[in-house]
């Protein structure tokens, strides 16, 4: 969309209504410019795929973004619920924005119903439409979905990530959302 024309993070704040942005101490000027421009392109894809306005990317103005600033071990990117910030790692975050925004949207939905956390993990307090969506990740026609079976398989293969991480409702929500965005863009 922009062909690497932006050199200042202000464009992300203005276009998408983000609350703030942060760069890690070890990001070079070149890293920062690359991150800004890749995030711009990813956000352009995201709002078009979801069918919202660019400003709605910030989920009511509360979402922030960081680049190489808040890394966690081997993660490519992560969403911090308590800070409402998406962190893209310096070297491995490319392609992860839709997934992390899915986590942010999950939290935003919960917030709309007075719940701190993820809507997908607090179904008893959510409307039927959210319950039905999350249930569809795990079960169709009384049988476990391939998506859920595969997620449980990864739970067994990658135990270091935490027991049940891959098959947790909030992780499945974010992965399903990222797939939805990809399908809409194809």
Placement of each model-derived feature along the sequence:
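Active-site-flanking segments in enzyme catalytic domains
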Residues: 1-37, 44, 48-186
